[in-house]
Amino acid sequence: MYYWRLCEVFYQFRTNNNLSPAELCAFLYDFAPNFISKENTEIPKPSQAWCIGGLIDPAEVYDITFWQANPETKKGDILIHYETSPISAITCIWIAQADGVIDPFFHYYSNTYIGDKIDIPRITLKELQTDKYFSKHPLVRKKFQGVNGWPMSSEDYSELLRMIKAKGFDTDTLPKLYTPTLPKNVSIEIERDVEQQLLEPLLNSMEWYENKDFIRQLPIHAGRGHRVFPDYALHYDNKPDYERAKVLIEAKLHMKNNREVEEAFLQARSYALLLDSSVIVLCDKQCLIIYEKKDSFDRDRYKKYHWVDFENPDIFNELKNKLNYK
């Protein structure tokens, strides 16, 4: 229904301006993108690396180029470009200039804008096939078929940097996957220390900030004349009597055993039901426990992370995606 309405709008615009179908396409895909000013925003640090592919025609490459990509691509992500036959090699690295989108007017399923191209020494398919690490990689084994939008782990990217460095290239000039620098040697003595020294720095590293993306002690009605105050509400709406939060977070000093975890879970679940939350997070000085709602919250279905785990870009990105309910 919406697609048909969109077609009607474009048709009306074309006829009102006496444009042919070809001229309308030229306007949409060439004139408008090149002449309508774009918002100049800072490129975020990369949280994920992806592979893209295809031959690069120098005549069609601009500072920012339209390219097929994974719809989950985020602005700032690293894009490793494999040029297909006859080159058959990784030749450059780009940075995503926009989030990936699904475009019904594009020949391929999804795309993004790419820029900040960095040429690197060619890493050929043959070299990858004989490399101890990449010879077992599924994308290499199928000779980069379906390359566009293939996710690369932090280990994949590190191993690729190893091969590039071996060719004498200064890999310090290449983008690095982002991991937060969480406080070291923290002194955790009370529950508030867990919140201020561990939880809030982690949320800030994901670019979520207090009173913008999350709120502490959100007052919610829990019966006639009674209010409760969950520790943190992430992606929240604090409209009185209609309070909502996509993610509910409860912090404790130390959940020493299953009984204490059970008590914290039951408390958090009661708040989550009032706020129509999709995710519950329990955290203490040692770890975070994530419960995702599948029809209901299940005490026995969870994912556990230790704070040190977030030094791994893949794990950091995995948690961010779990909490990124909008």
Where would I find each of the regions flagged by the language model?
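C-terminal accessory module of base-excision DNA glycosylases/AP lyases that mediates lesion recognition
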Residues: 1-47, 159-161, 166
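Contiguous surface segments at macromolecular interaction interfaces
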Residues: 36-46, 58-65, 103-178
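Accessory interdomain/linker segments of ATP-dependent helicases and helicase-like nucleic-acid enzymes
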Residues: 42-59, 189, 193
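Short, surface-exposed secondary-structure edge patches
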Residues: 67-72
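A short, conserved, highly charged catalytic patch centered on acidic carboxylates
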Residues: 75, 84, 175-279, 287-326
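Short, charged beta-turn/beta-strand-edge "cap" motif at the junction between a beta-strand
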Residues: 83-89
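Short beta-strand-centered aromatic/proline hotspots
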Residues: 89-101
